[in-house]
Amino acid sequence: MDSFSKLSGIQHDVFISFRGTDTRHGFLSHLRKELRQKQIDAYVDDRPESGDQISPALLRAIKESLISLIIFSKDYASSKWCLEELVQIIECMEKQKQIVIPVFYNTDPSNVRHQKGSYGDALSNHGECYEERVPIWRSALKEAANLSGFHSSNYE
């Protein structure tokens, strides 16, 4: 990261949004290693989810990143935190022109786009407690899934 980026409010090259149970010890660890070797500063929240609200520091990290990389995995939508991160990422894409890159890791992009399979199940389960947030999450999932990205089945 160069000094110009720091002056312009950018603190991280990449913010990575992921569901830890699906990706932390495999795909994500390999990705982080490769990014470090290329001296790319990636913000990865390693703390376990706790509480109802995402921390202000995490929301700030999203806003202060040049790129957001969303790793959509089978259980991504089961996490309220992941969905709230996604909403913030989409807002940054629209307002700050942040670059957003979706990666579909062991999940089909159409399941994310149309909220089928595990995505549909997760949103149905969330509807019981977060009825007012589910339409916002659905919209963010659809918008992100329509972006150009990478599908892991293309690289196996």
List where the protein language model places each region:
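Conserved N-terminal substructure of TIR/SEFIR domains
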Residues: 1-67
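Cross-kingdom TIR/SEFIR domain
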Residues: 33-38, 54-156
